[in-house]
Amino acid sequence: MPFDRQPLLSGEKGMPATSLWLVGGAVIAAVCVIVNTSYNGTQLSVTARPIQAAVSQVSMARFAESGVSRGSGNRVSQAVPLMAASVGAESESRRWVASAILFPLSGLFAAVALKMAMMKPKVAAVLPFTSEKDMKVWNPVNNKKFETFSYLPPLSDAQIAKQVDMIIAKGLSPCLEFAAPENSFIANDNTVRFSGTAAGYYDNRYWTMWKLPMFGCTDASQVLREISECRRAYPQCYVRLAAFDSVKQVQVISFVVQRPSGSSSSSWGMAAMTGEKDMKVWNPVNNKKFETFSYLPPLSDAQIAKQVDMIIAKGLSPCLEFAAPENSFIANDNTVRFSGTAAGYYDNRYWTMWKLPMFGCTDASQVLREISECRRAYPQCYVRLAAFDSVKQVQVISFVVQRPSGSSSSWGMAAMTGEKDMKVWNPVNNKKFETFSYLPPLSDAQIAKQVDMIIAKGLSPCLEFAAPENSFIANDNTVRFSGTAAGYYDNHYWTMWKLPMFGCTDASQVLREISECRRAYPQCYVRLAAFDSVKQVQVISFVVQRPSGSSSSSWGMAAMTGEKDMKVWNPVNNKKFETFSYLPPLSDAQIAKQVDMIIAKGLSPCLEFAAPENSFIANDNTVRFSGTAAGYYDNRYWTMWKLPMFGCTDASQVLREISECRRAYPQCYVRLAAFDSVKQVQVISFVVQRPSGSSSSWGMAAMTGEKDMKVWNPVNNKKFETFSYLPPLSDAQIAKQVDMIIAKGLSPCLEFAAPENSFIANDNTVRFSGTAAGYYDNRYWTMWKLPMFGCTDASQVLREISECRRAYPQCYVRLAAFDSVKQVQVISFVVQRPSGSSSSSSWGMAAMTGEKEMKVWNPVNNKKFETFSYLPPLSDAQIAKQVDMIIAKGLSPCLEFAAPENSFIANDNTVRFSGTAAGYYDNRYWTMWKLPMFGCTDASQVLREISECRRAYPQCYVRLAFDSVKQVQVISFVVQRPSGSSSSSWGMAAMTGEKDMKVWNPVNNKKFETFSYLPPLSDAQIAKQVDMIIAKGLSPCLEFAAPENSFIANDNTVRFSGTAAGYYDNRYWTMWKLPMFGCTDASQVLREISECRRAYPQCYVRLAAFDSVKQVQVISFVVQRPSGSSSSSWGMAAMTGEKEMKVWNPVNNKKFETFSYLPPLSDAQIAKQVDMIIAKGLSPCLEFAAPENSFIANDNTVRFSGTAAGYYDNRYWTMWKLPMFGCTDASQVLREISECRRAYPQCYVRLAAFDSVKQVQVISFVVQRPSSGGRSW
């Protein structure tokens, strides 16, 4: 049989003639073995003999690796009994026949092995089995662990070629990477810690790329040649082959094709290749590491041109960047640390751009000229060429085309003669601007050329400036991006020179503005940005003035004569506003011109003001953005002057408001914002008044027409957000606003709060992450009754306001516009301030006579519930009216309850939302009373449940509501407060009709989430729930846990970030077998419950409804509590029909996630699961790990953020070969499991179902536990 690898390439020499007799002898010996086997009538067993044969082959492979390859003679003799063990004889009398044949056969094999070891002493001879896959893996025991594919053994060319063919067939690009040993493992300085992304099979470390990804590669031999060249160049480095997805910009799969010589594995001895590529790379050993492409050697023009042609062909724009050595490496001050994005092949450092990206470049010679010019200008700098994607605003690929002179290799490229018309300032020992900052003083012609390109792309030119002390990156004027790609825009806040030049069609307009700004601010930096008014981001920017007296050449541009009609205040030594704040006092004509532009864009003018001490950026009035681009809106909360002017069609209306606001607040800043009512964000804003006594006086004529609203004085006044300074409003004023709210399809909603709870504080506020700053107040106040869904008349709202004012004269009351689709407050304003406060005139509204039928409890000095908690005891009629509304909205009524000590917001029963809007649902986990009432059509059903729950828990809070589609609480309100509390007693008549479930007592009882207090259920009760689960297309799924592991704790719980609070339990329990995909009968589930109960009488058992599409638990409830607990004993009759799987005992047993307690499985059991995996279009995938690496730990686990808890294990184990893409037969998987078990008897082995589309493990279960621990196999 073939013992060594196939010939490497066509250029490799063939086998010498002197060894032909050895091969011939081996063939003759093999024929003898076949004759001997036939003669003895050997019969191979289906279950035993192939495993014995495979074991002997593994032993022979080990012998070939460790013995023959090292020339060990002692190992040769040891191979004889190993081979003899693979052949069995039937009778003792015929043993001499086998011995007579095997003796010369052993000699022949020894001679062959000796000859091969002498010819190729460095080859790792991997034995390719005929019935098995062609890859082995290194031993992970006591071995520092690589991710994913790292333990694969030295692979032959045939083995690698087979994998490359699969990579190419999938439309991926092969990509070689390498790294010195000290940089090859996971560490913070060369690893992306993923947040908000699934655990796909790509390695999240930055290694160095060997040349560019092989885009367009169609032949495995091309890859083999590259591997050979890389091996010769870096015998002391790891080398891996990755499959690179050029669309998603991620590595999809990768595996190691070289381990450093001298390591525990065999050395690499591949024959040198004759055909070599035209690029080399620098030596990374003991060399400070660049990311991705940095070790590429000095490239010739032909080499660069070839890459540029590929870049242009892909529709990308070449883009040159450079950096002084001290700024060229990864550091916090010049790097974006990505969160929530895949690891694409772009470099996440900010270097300085050499001129603008070469948009529209069609010829590599243009790029070569730029490279030559940049090299001459900066011989002491690194220079890299990037491929810039102008649509996604990211660098896609980049590689270094110059390393500073004096480094390891000299540059000998001929100087270019044709040069572009721009130079750049010297970055050496120069405080670094981002992206475009080193560009030299530009002539008008140069600027005009760039402006033409900006206009042609549909962008708006936009001038900005800043005093030197504010122009660099610093925390107080910079957005640190999280969850966004590194586009070419500058993430500092400079001051805008007037508004973006929307609709600009002529570069001369921009040149005039630049001239004016230069004259006004000779000591400031000025930059020209291209502003995208759709995405609200700067796309590109470059400096058009540096302060006079700096190191650059003087500016000699001719002064412009035509000037615009706006000036700006001097920012020098002036506390800086964001974006628009230095604009000068504007005339009515100037403001009107801007307002016309705002209205034309479909935006709503919106006035805001603030006292000086509250007008600047500070934590208590500012949203720190996370996960959002830096649009041109000011991320501070000022106070709104009346509501946004929705439907405004005339600038004169705005001018009247500005005049009125100025007269009311001469000591305040006032700004005019353009408010986008769809996205709920400020888009642009500029200051129209600065406090009197400042650097410039205001001379605008007073306006005569005034609106009918005033606002309270914000000076020395604790500040509300957004709408809080509005004055006492008349009924007519409120009615006008309510009409606007109703016309927009929103629902009026009253809220109130005691003064001590009404301001921003951590315990009553949502701190937004990943969401824009909309005009809603992110505090939780108490709702006055439910949102007024379906309200069509402002008089209904006025009656409610009147009633709420009478009930709570010492509380703040606000009216919010509630969007029932997005579940957020859109706008809100205060309609009452507590009596006796510093404010304004008392409230004199006539008392309303018609009142609603609900009151609320007093929140004063009362521990606050969220949202709906102060509602008073409700009558049946009141509750029924609300239930009818809930049912009409397609929601499911759902009762919950909690003991008083567990009912308030606390870390152990509350989800702290990140990245989600503040909807009207309560983000606490209470205990569900039975399941949500799916399909409920009658309020009387709910009333009966409320009555039963009240009788069972007179000392508990009880609340009602649930949305079964979004798996969130949409609305909820308390229908019982514990007896003995300050509210009136409950006098509802007891209901007679009761449901068939009770719940355990939660008082002084360690709390389960969601469904845990349900009582022991009868078979009929469980079957009824299972029928509902199946009818919804969900899969029943049993889980269990020992008592000490069953509660919420950090080691078995997912803390959700960025996801809604659905009704599933966010703890990891152990799954009893796999989810019951395709289950159609409740009796199947009852049999499983019975079996699990008998196996684990001391464990909790719960039944979950598993959604196989979303990969989440949707609902779950406990069907067993440990014996000896406070609940009644379980008396269910034992079931006779059992499934074919058992599980290990979890009691006092370190816990695996999800599937880990499954028992040793037979081949038939595994094959049945593999058939299900294949039928779902998934790929079987084996993984293994040494015991010390197999459990959850920071170095081998992804901590999920922003993703649901699907049934896949979020640990990195080592893959046994590649995922079995295209596997169609369970027997293939069984052979791999058998081989892996023999190779690693002391390791855990698991079988995963790998989704090659989503790049995630979907399901996995253990098929081997180490022989030294736990139950034997």
Curated annotation (Swiss-Prot):
* Listed CDD domains: RuBisCO_small
Concerning PTM, the database record says: Eight small subunits are processed from a large polyprotein. All start with the same sequence but there is more heterogeneity at the C-terminus.
Any idea which residues the transit peptide spans? 1-134
A GO biological process this protein is involved in?
A: reductive pentose-phosphate cycle
* Domain of life per record: Eukaryota
Extract one GO cellular component term from the record: chloroplast
Gene Ontology molecular function, alphabetical? ribulose-bisphosphate carboxylase activity
Predominant place of localization: plastid
**In which compartments does the protein localize?**
Plastid, Chloroplast
Provide the residue ranges of the propeptide in this protein: 269-278, 412-421, 556-565, 699-708, 844-853, 987-996, 1131-1140
What's this protein's function? RuBisCO catalyzes two reactions: the carboxylation of D-ribulose 1,5-bisphosphate, the primary event in carbon dioxide fixation, as well as the oxidative fragmentation of the pentose substrate. Both reactions occur simultaneously and in competition at the same active site. Although the small subunit is not catalytic it is essential for maximal activity.
Q: Which HAMAP family match?
A: RuBisCO_S_bact
Family from the record: Belongs to the RuBisCO small chain family.
UniProt-recorded name of the protein: Ribulose bisphosphate carboxylase small subunit, chloroplastic
Give the organism, scientific name: Euglena gracilis
